[in-house]
């Protein structure tokens, strides 16, 4: 029995040590695993606490980095924090690891209270930090972390001197920097200490035009943190700063601070061996320049929230918005701004119809230069072949040349429409080139025109002696025989107008009585008393009343 008791004691001791080992194993688990079981993935915890930063100046310039850490847990907790902008921000910020502040001697303490029941020490060594420009005045802060839910109690830091010039680099030298994170819970305490000394770095800030009093303050309204199940989490926040005067709470070894733009912005990114902290801040601040050696900066973040990184796969959406005529496509990772393709302006484009001025001038030139000469040539041809009458020359009885004009085609058409018949070969107009209605037929000769003309060779009834229609033929024969005397052919006769047959007393009896042309009893001698001689032997037949002239 005595031997069994030690065995039982050993077994109980071994079981007790086993339970202790299990308990230690449970306590050594990462806080993210415990928080995953304790807190839902979509839950967020909000807390509001002031964050005070005080900076003190020390004139030491070292370029070495010293990081000391101690951990009471066998399994380290690795936290990876990166930043991205939400659709409310105007652009995505890509952070690089460059430091743009020069601190002489600063110490920073952060204390936070936690609701988890575990105790661990997390040590992280800072390797590099950077400040890069960004753009916004005030945005919502959201971040995700693998650390348990905690609330920042206070932050203190001391700045030796800061110099910020227009369009120049801000250089701050840091000798040593201590970051202490303390988290309180019901049954455990998490603390970590980091001692770093950073060499001189530079940052370029946009040009400034205003300056403010040597002290400035800003507020942190609230912060929310929620745990994430993954070791690499996404942490994003932004804060809004407004410069104002406040009481000095830190001593500065430098006599002046620099001025910066009234609207400038920067992004601070800090990376360490065991954790990566990346923050995006969009402040609108103005620093001051003064000879007062004391200055204080009290900053309070506007609001911050932590969203688990596991939900970002579901939140990768594209948001389209139209702001002042511009279409903006944005998601959680990038922001693209496009100019509008169509404007909604009320003004309408004026359209003119018809030919342009150049084409109109070309057409006018072609019409005037080509069409007008063609029209003139056509009119001339119409006049020459259609309007102008044909000219015909005649020789009259006196041997003079008389010009007559044949009727034109328009006259013929007009007469044809009127129903008047005109012989083309026999109808001529007067001596007028245009022609007139004095159209005569040379084939039809009126006897009265022959008797009443001025031709001296033409006999007239008044000049015929002894001619009387009432007298009988015997009386006429006696008068003719008594008054007739042969004078022969007068010298006035022309060869063409000489009588083919003449009559005298000697040869008048040679004609046959049966001659059908002329009979002795019917032939009357024409004698003109007004002239000294007989102009012509002119014989007529009183039966038919026709005058026969020997032409």
UniProtKB/Swiss-Prot annotation:
Signal peptide feature range: 1-35
Keyword Transmembrane helix annotated: yes
Disulphide bond pairs: none
Modified sites of kind Phosphoserine: 481-482
Cytoplasmic-facing ranges: 383-551
GO cellular component, one term: plasma membrane
Bias type Low complexity, positions: 498-508
Places the protein is found: Membrane
Transmembrane segments: 362-382
Keyword terms of this UniProt record: Membrane, Phosphoprotein, Signal, Stress response, Transmembrane, Transmembrane helix
Skewed-composition ranges (Acidic residues): 466-477
Coiled-coil boundaries: none
Compositionally biased spans, kind Polar residues: 430-441
Pfam families reported in the protein's UniProt record: Mid2
Record region (Disordered): 108-143, 206-227, 243-263, 429-513
Impact after mutating residue 427 to K: In strain: SK1
Chief location of this protein within or outside the cell: membrane
Superkingdom field: Eukaryota
Membrane-side (Extracellular) residue stretches: 36-361
Family named by the database record: Belongs to the MID2 like cell wall stress sensor family.
Identification of the protein by name: Protein MTL1
Annotated source species: Saccharomyces cerevisiae (strain ATCC 204508 / S288c)
